[in-house]
């Protein structure tokens, strides 16, 4: 029997994950009191294979009952029952945005002090996070990307040895994306904005792309950038990191950063990674440029 404990920060996407797991044959129970884990596992083991994949969502909604989780997991281990822990998290800014959009109340912030509730929750969950088998940060994942990550982990034959890489082009005048692990400033490349024929085009247009890539310093930068990510990604994976967010910035986020991001996207797509790209500031009218 495969026993999975799902926990993590409120608002990080546990409900979505449960849906994806149910779709691939997991028997899921939401908000189970930790004291019942052992009993429930015994029942499943006695089902003669009818229940072979189980996912239990256990989080701070249980209040003080959550304190029983670690002792109960230790008891499972002592009784010879194997389990895995999936821990979901997201950045404070993303969690606050999700709560405001959903208008839901955080379990530890009934008075509305969201940031205080999130901070308290992180402290409570710190020990279980350290023992997690898998940690997924959903801050920069679309539902489709999150589903792909779940399938990669829990569907036999779907697991891959690469990394989920998100590339974000942006304009420094609009701020650096808070979710970035790495940020590269490409404002050293001559700016197509000042050439009339390219001023209102973007780095996705061939004329702009060819212009940006025509400089010797661009070619040297791309060589060094490729070498760096080829060095970093395997070492990140070795340390247990499964996602990487790379930011590429220029002044306005329409020309140079877009062209460089597209080039990096094409390069990484040829590797064993799942790569996504988002031109955050290419168009400020709200249209999505993610793929």
From Swiss-Prot:
Gene3D superfamilies: P-loop containing nucleotide triphosphate hydrolases. Keywords: ATP-binding, GTP-binding, Nucleotide-binding. GTP binds at residues 59-62. ATP binds at residues 8-15. GO terms for molecular function: ATP binding; GTP binding. Displays ATPase and GTPase activities. Belongs to the RapZ-like family. This is Nucleotide-binding protein Cthe_0113. It comes from Acetivibrio thermocellus (strain ATCC 27405 / DSM 1237 / JCM 9322 / NBRC 103400 / NCIMB 10682 / NRRL B-4536 / VPI 7372).
